[in-house]
């Protein structure tokens, strides 16, 4: 397809959430507490994991990584969205748009990889308890964590480079509340079929491989739990995995809805991505703290030390 002979775009206009004209301040008041709770909840988990010696285990090491991810993931899109909901500028520079897309997919793919690693950690702990500390030693844990970040960087670099090597020389109105591939590609003044195919394949392949590995881990875990003779033993083993399973279900629904539909629905995609960017990162701390006695105990200890909660 021939590139149009026009001036190159230097900035984009984010049109925001469709069909919400006149509701900006209402949405701001609604979304701001979600974002604040996301930051507060994940900081709390991170502080609990770092300050409690009992939580210096592989499981909580990866949970701490997930908390860092959740804070970063929300912060990629939410501050700009909240600013224009307040009535400030909807403009975003070309470079900022590139950065927003890169970090959105960088941190988004890390979630898939990290959930896969966390499933493997639970599989090792339940299926090979006597060898757990040997298999999941500190060096392996660090290597797995670094690996998730490196793979996320590679994945995001591919998608970002394919999206922004295309020329943008026509309309600059992004029909979305942040810079993402489905909203940007229609603005390109060149053939986008390669970028569409690669992004669909890349996201689909990563999601499928991670999901299958998680499914394999939890199939083995379920078999092992059912073989435990005592009811209390089965209950304790299941309680360590149930929070992780809930978080996985919350993560994979939006991925399928937004990126893996043959004919995406823009309105549905926007609603789902708001839930993914705001609600998902806020729910993870709640899921893990409400169902985990060790995290709750660590948080209570911190509050006791700071004098916010009296000793019982």
Swiss-Prot record:
One of its GO terms (molecular function) is olfactory receptor activity. InterPro entries: GPCR_Rhodpsn, GPCR_Rhodpsn_7TM, Olfact_rcpt. CDD domains: 7tmA_OR10D-like. The chain crosses the membrane at residues 27-47, 58-78, 98-118, 140-160, 198-218, 240-260, 267-287. Residues 1-26, 79-97, 161-197, 261-266 are extracellular. It is a multi-pass membrane protein. One of its GO terms (cellular component) is plasma membrane. It is found in: Cell membrane. GO terms for biological process: detection of chemical stimulus involved in sensory perception of smell. PANTHER family: OLFACTORY RECEPTOR. Odorant receptor. This is Olfactory receptor 10D3. It comes from Homo sapiens. The lineage of its organism: Eukaryota, Metazoa, Chordata, Craniata, Vertebrata.
